[in-house]
Amino acid sequence: AIKNGKFDDTNIEVIFHEGACSDTMEYNGKYMMENNFEYTKTLMHFALKKKIQLIYASSASTYGSGKHGFSEKPACEEALNVYAFSKLFFDNYARRYFDAAESQIVGLRYFNVYGPQENHKGKMASMIFQMFNQWKAEGKVKLFEGIDGYGNGEQVRDFIYVKDVVKVNFFFWDHPELKGIYNCGTGHAHTFNTLAKGVLKYFGSGELEYVPF
């Protein structure tokens, strides 16, 4: 529709581009790049042409294992799957336009987002959502055993509530002078054990089981 000029005469202030193929197990590179790179590129050039603010979803997966840190700079970036590569590829493409762009381009690197309305996400739903479903189905929560120096359930992630993500998006909408790539997380990591124990405490019963990785 954008390529056909359907939106050329519309008065749009901002585009929040949150759509993507987010399946980290997807190995079809052509499919992933069409959805996560080519479509986003089309949106960006439309926004630049019309001087519309563009705030798009990048991903903390662009940091890989995190062994290089989590700063928004190339030295920390290491895509480990097709999804992460597609996100990083567009981030690097967008970087070429930041300085000369006459309208806002912002990429938000979401960490582990959780919250309501995750039913449609299947295996890509948040760990918290999956733990709740495990308890409802089996009365217990399962976590992976330790690996790569981590103890049982001691793997860590930065979990951010979806409504806080919305607030961050709106912050950048209110500050059109800002451009670039920004992390979108809490800045604090929590273990899977902490989450699992919180779920069990909420329900008031159940057990925690560790399974081989």
Regions found by a protein language model. Name each.
Residues 15-17, 41-82:
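Conserved Rossmann-fold NAD(P)-dependent oxidoreductase catalytic core, especially the SDR/UDP-sugar
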Residues 2-35:
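NAD(P)H-binding glycine-rich loop region in Rossmannoid oxidoreductase-like domains
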Residues 33-40, 44-47, 55, 86-87, ...:
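Short alpha-helix in the Rossmann-fold core of NAD(P)-dependent oxidoreductases
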Residues 137-213:
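C-terminal substrate-binding subdomain of Rossmann-fold SDR/epimerase-dehydratase oxidoreductases
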Residues 33, 79-88, 122-129, 158-159, ...:
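Short-chain dehydrogenase/reductase
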